[in-house]
């Protein structure tokens, strides 16, 4: 018996240049395992697996090959649920886009607009900003992961301006001295001192982003050579290796300054997560992650990219929040609507479009149950094997298998393997 409310999906993949190569990529392995017609090319990158209704790469029903958009449109009340339809004003699209990313080379340093700025940018430049939505996003590590996330604490940036001559040369003595002499530590977020700190940080960032090409390249080259030949001349122990590694990928790039020197270098272990708010700068460096985001493709880029860089909008739009790296990491909470033998936790960012559940099993056998959620969801198996039962049918779940589950459908997960792990993106109104 087939079900209209629970079925397997085929997810498309993207072969962006920064993806892991061939079968070293989780994206490639998931795509090939779930669809035997996919033959992995060991010379090509496999960067992203897309699960959802985004028009660029919509998922399709595994059996019928109908797009998820068309399936939702024919039965939106039952599959999406009236409350979610009313909130997000769509009968054939999900408000989130669910992905797996396999990262070999650093992605562009970027930020995403909020809703207000998204509308403005789309109206003014639809070629570079293809929709009018915001794009907050969350990343959950499934292997060891590195990224840049948010500005470093100001005292770290001030110390770098004093001890890294190439950074100071790019920023210039006047702005460097103004920053070092006037920033304040330990101030309240809502205070005028905090607002002044952000203005000082913006000045430094703008100087980096608008530095003349010859000055930038000379100093980037000099800093990379010094990091390689004399790493002990840097105070931070991991900075020289990072500069050398990223300079190999993008030689003499502005990202060596606006990324390596100004943004937090964040390392996650599997299961740890980051939430990246609109207007906060970030970049993924390496690793495999589950990613969920509001369904948008708007990106304002700064560095480590051959693509369009919108420096003016980027400098103006950022929040210039600055926090230690520990504050960027997001913790999960136990999900109260799950039971049985599995452990189900929820990553619940402070936005309406999505949350993500992770279900694991500590023992080789057992079943986990999850009550019907008040909105649509997409599940992917990332490790191990088992079964998922819902709406009167039981389907095999293996790495890379993707499923859609309609609103208000209770689910049972059964493990046949101690490593059986699923991630489930969902929305409720």
UniProtKB/Swiss-Prot annotation:
Top enzyme category: isomerase
Give the keywords, sorted: Cytoplasm, Isomerase, Metal-binding, Zinc
Which biological process annotations from GO are given for this protein? carbohydrate metabolic process; cell wall mannoprotein biosynthetic process; GDP-mannose biosynthetic process; protein glycosylation
List the catalytic residues: 301
SUPFAM superfamilies, per database record: RmlC-like cupins
- Pathway(s) served: Nucleotide-sugar biosynthesis; GDP-alpha-D-mannose biosynthesis; alpha-D-mannose 1-phosphate from D-fructose 6-phosphate: step 1/2
This entry's comment on the bound cofactor is: Binds 1 zinc ion per subunit.
Positions with a binding annotation for Zn(2+): 110, 112, 137, 282
**TM region positions:** none
**The EC number(s) this enzyme carries:** 5.3.1.8
Please tell me one Gene Ontology term that the record gives under cellular component: cytosol
This protein's cofactor list reads: Zn(2+)
Q: Where in the cell is it found?
A: Cytoplasm
Single GO MF annotation = zinc ion binding
Q: Which reaction does it catalyse?
A: D-mannose 6-phosphate = D-fructose 6-phosphate
What Pfam families does the database record attribute to this sequence?
PMI_typeI_C, PMI_typeI_cat, PMI_typeI_hel
The organism's place on the tree of life at top rank: Eukaryota
The UniProt family comment states:
Belongs to the mannose-6-phosphate isomerase type 1 family.
Q: According to its UniProt entry, what is the function of this protein?
A: Involved in the synthesis of the GDP-mannose and dolichol-phosphate-mannose required for a number of critical mannosyl transfer reactions.
Protein name according to UniProt = Mannose-6-phosphate isomerase
Q: Origin organism of this chain?
A: Candida glabrata (strain ATCC 2001 / BCRC 20586 / JCM 3761 / NBRC 0622 / NRRL Y-65 / CBS 138) (Yeast)
